């Protein structure tokens, strides 16, 4: 940051609980309760860098009694770092981690909490788009949440293996039912 001032704006692409990716990394398995993660967020607060956190909102193939485990750990992390700007990539979803029945309610729990106004959600992935436009109800409810909190949702370029601009536009276009809602 001192060598190239103004060049870097954030820390992206770091994963904690991300489907089966986290288990493939050598060394200790990342965790939302690991003090090392606190040091990263302390640094982002101190330096003014934002962070894009890739972590699942729940476990793959989650059983109902465990659906809030990762979510509650994320809430605790967010509360410990109120001066860090945090973007939760893909609203915590993925190829295997699909929305549970109250997924949007969980997001709204964060959005409605004034102590968590530093947390944003990125929706730029074709897997997320599939869930959002899967049914008219899913699209309508997502649109209502975005309309209620329009400054907390981001559509960026965080798409897996993006090789050309047309791929980015294809993801954007998948959301057309949401844009029309």
Briefly describe each language-model feature range.
Residues 3, 32, 62-69, 98-99, ...:
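Extracytoplasmic/periplasmic, Sec-exported soluble proteins
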Residues 85-181:
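H/E-rich (His + Asp/Glu) clusters that bind or coordinate divalent metals
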Residues 50, 82-85:
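Short, proline-centered helix/strand-breaking motifs
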Residues 1-9, 39-46, 76-82, 107-116, ...:
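Acidic (Asp/Glu)-rich catalytic clusters
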Residues 26-37, 66-73, 101-106, 135-141:
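Charged helix-capping and loop-helix junction motifs
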Residues 1-59, 120, 125:
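Active-site gating/metal-coordination segments in enzymes
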Residues 53, 62, 66, 89, ...:
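Single, functionally critical "micro-switch" positions that shape active/binding sites
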Residues 12, 28, 61-62, 95, ...:
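Conserved short-loop catalytic and cofactor-binding motifs
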